[in-house]
Amino acid sequence: MDWDRRSMLAGLGAAALPFQQRPTEAAAGHRTRLILLGTAGGPRPRKRRSGSAQAIVIGDKIFVIDCGDGVARQMALAGLPLRQLRHVFVTHHHSDHNIDLGALLQLAWISGLVTPVDCWGPPPISGMIKDYLRYQEHDIALRIKDEGRIPLAPLIRSHDLGDGGPVFQDEQVRVTAAKVPHPPLDLALAYRFDTPDRSIVISGDTRESEELVKLAADADVLVHEVMLAQRVRELVRNLPNRDALARSVISHHTTAEQVGRVA
């Protein structure tokens, strides 16, 4: 994606999941928070907006969904300590959603991370993280030797996901994934987070999807990508491949009207 679009925050209006279907009741002060760290579409840097990324904060644990350009800085601006990062979920492997995955992990480590971080996403997320650690092995080794830091690699646990289903559960959250259509990729995922006080669904990039509708049933909050087709045509009108590019972009994403139907 290389055009402007906003992630649309849509409350679904239905009741949240009954309490007995949720993880353990949250302790006082452990309410679930959602922070939109970046809503820009496409990898091209913007003056005022950062790449696709969201944070869900449950107690003192931070869950990051997608790692677009600037995610670590946006966390700092939002007052989210990088050392409290516990899970990273990548929806799909386009660069505007994963370009800062490795940087986020390394910067969290530099910021005092000593607790393992689980990274989830479509293949080849495990290989990508290994490649990033090799790319930065000189800096990492120097910081371990010179600054007395613990090794970074053992702190990162990566998980290649399949087509959907249960992903992770503990006493505070249950995470479920669903496969969504985002050609030409073979696998793109949406995620649902059920906590004691709310249910949040992150669509990632997708066309209108019945699987996403099922995943988001009775959720409290849906963060859904949205594309303005006319705006796409305006942005590409001076490019030599404008017709093919516009046709590709519009067929791979969700219009505002379609998002309304999903919600």
Predicted regions and their residues:
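Binuclear metal-dependent hydrolase catalytic cores
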Residues: 2-5, 9-17, 22-201, 207
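Cap/insert and terminal regions of metallo-dependent hydrolase folds
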Residues: 189-190, 197-199, 207-263
